[in-house]
């Protein structure tokens, strides 16, 4: 009997992944279904407009691989349009601040999305179930609308000032210019319509992942962004591909930790573990105050190095001929 776990911040998304496994899907099928479901249930941190990387362990082959689908800057982006103004950005990451935060929100902040290409590559390599079946839960849930609970209100309220700047964002996430909130009644349910997202997911399910980069979806995305003043083009979308990478192998206390390489958190994790291995002796029991202090010092030191030194080489990732634009 197969015993498996699916972890997600959203309980419903985890259930979708578990349902895919119960239907005979590979763990990668569950990842794909979970990814697109999260884009509906938690659109503030997930979705087809983002990017990332995944570390996969294939037990039968005893092989670890990384699928890299990090975002890339549009080819027409001009660095001079993003002057630094001093201080730290207002974003979660303390990068150097850019004038008007134009790298954080608005049409000028939009890179070439990688999530769909990443799921496409994972599906091509390992999936058992049809693409459209894995997207069906996200289509259904988008049709139900975004459930407004305290977490929804908190997340939207934290970005409401920026959402109000852009009509499309305000229409999707605000009610009369204000964040939505749940009603006081214990049985009352408030939902935000997600009709446009449902139509997008249905198109993506029916037409396949390349439609996002080369078809009707690609043209719609590029047209909307360019009309708003952004640089993303259909050419940028058509050129995007996810890539298979060798994992970063991090030796740690006699074992090996596998992580994502290059412009991800993997190198920072490697530096953190390297510092810890030197600064902290293995504990006989649980971590104590000395251990927690060592964790904090190693993380802070590694992150300072990340902010100071990590980035593209001459504006391009050193990946060979495929590197056609700076990565994000």
Predicted regions, residues:
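Short helix-capping/linker segments at secondary-structure and domain boundaries
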Residues: 124-129, 206-209, 276-283, 307-310
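Stable alpha-helical structural segments in soluble proteins, enriched in small hydrophobic residues
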Residues: 34, 118, 122, 275, ...
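Noncatalytic scaffold domains of N-terminal-nucleophile
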Residues: 1-15, 19, 27-207, 212-214, ...
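Internal maturation/activation junctions in enzymes
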Residues: 168, 176-178, 278-328
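Flexible, polar/acidic helix-loop-strand segments at domain edges
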Residues: 267
